[in-house]
Amino acid sequence: MGIDRILFMPDTFQIGRTVMSDLARDGLLEAELCVLDMPITASYEDTIRAAELMEAMGAGCCVVLGGDGTSRAAAKGLDETPILPVSTGTNNVYPTLTEGTVAGMAAAAAAILGPSENCRIRDKRIEISINGRFADIALVDAVITADLWVGAKAIWDTGKLRRVIATRCHPSSIGFSSVAGCVGVVRDTDDFGVDAVLGDTGERVLAPVAAGVLSTVSISHIERMPLD
């Protein structure tokens, strides 16, 4: 389809080098294949750094394999390069289950056609600040909880949830964004997000807040959030 170079992120399982070896043996591709020359730490920081390098090297599209967290890490390292997020597991909201050949064709089209064609969107994200200083981003949702302990950052007690802010939401999306999604659907192409305030009173919804977990939550107030 006209792609002349394909970059791989290095990883501890040597996935990129295995793919390169198999393709070279079979003679299936004419494109140049290479693994990024960068140290790895076996953490999400590798994904951020790889995304930064790919954008600096002029990548036209980044195919991200993984879940919501992997896509979020890649997004932290990119400014203008589009992401094609491919889900490699279940209960993901941001990446989608896509057949590999179709994903490759879409990535090639996005890289070749560029921003002038209607083949990409400027996605939404939530920017989180602490005491007025930028701290992090979220691609799908950010939650305010009354829980005092950070731990592994997994929240299981929905009774301590106070707010759910989401860029997109649907009742079938596993996670806290489904709480707002039970009231109304917000798509990735909509020019707004949603802010749901939770409490002891208000509309009660039964939401799939985690894989295999349904919780009843009361929404005292919900409103659209315009893009900034």
Locate each region found by the language model.
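Short, glycine/acidic-enriched capping/hinge loops at junctions between secondary-structure elements
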Residues: 17-21, 96, 154-155
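Structural signal for hydrophobic packing residues in well-ordered secondary-structure cores
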Residues: 2, 110-113, 146
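Short, solvent-exposed amphipathic alpha-helical segments in soluble enzyme
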Residues: 23-25, 78-80, 143-144, 159
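ATP/NTP phosphate-donor binding region
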Residues: 1-61
